[in-house]
């Protein structure tokens, strides 16, 4: 994927200009690319098994460290995506002392998320209809409309395609989680600008979540997901303190890298507190500006970060297409899917995502001006 991104990036001046845009948190661009790649690799193994044996699960032959690693890559990527979201928006609360116009905020979020989402679910519907038509228009609408709900509703099968959710690798539930976070942001904003500040808000959310988890009010996975956003908030708080200058140094980078690899390789379950601790410390380092010896500044990885939303929503379609093109084993299958995915996602970014992003940016001062004012 990195090689393909590098080749395509050289021929797309628009993509390169976006990658090179000044950023307050440049290392996060590369991290997004890493997360998208991790989710893709994880689902490649799952989809390969699905299209070869009919079961959505990791390769049956994988076990031990290799099996754990492949099995946990996806959850690691998703946890980091949640942390990035928590960090960016709580950092905004800290820097700008809240959000002045919540109506405008939600409109921008909708314009950022909805266009590509609606395009992808429409393509999914067309693919599923190719396998068989529903009994009539009303039946089709009954099947299709829940897919427009950003993951809030159970996804019924469309047309003749059994387990239609596998066409998107079941990722839509995470969008519902993100929207729930957006809905509680006004409360978080009040806490962030209160006397206690962001640190108190993060501490209160952690204590409340852990207490609810141990009382059985929320399940372990849900608690870990909530804490991912809290880790993002903690990183935003740390970014404004002297700890930032410690976490962005190479010794912390080495400790974080080893801890992350150990947690992903030795953990038998996803979304657990061990993984949260390791992934959380890794993220604290990245958010503090640690590029991990420049790896997160690698331009192809930043290109993948630029198109990470497209990769996240579209990789299931690429995996389905690749299953029709090759049966030469997992690695050839994965490479085939990547060769389809990255160019396709660059196109969806340029022609679906970017126009709406550019429209939102036109209403804001240039980033260079924002950086000078901080």
Whereabouts are the PLM-identified features?
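Residues within membrane-spanning alpha-helices of integral membrane proteins
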Residues: 29, 33-36, 78, 85, ...
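Hydrophobic alpha-helical transmembrane segments of integral membrane proteins
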Residues: 111-127, 205-217, 225
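Membrane-interface helix-loop-helix regions
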Residues: 56-76, 103, 114-179, 277-286
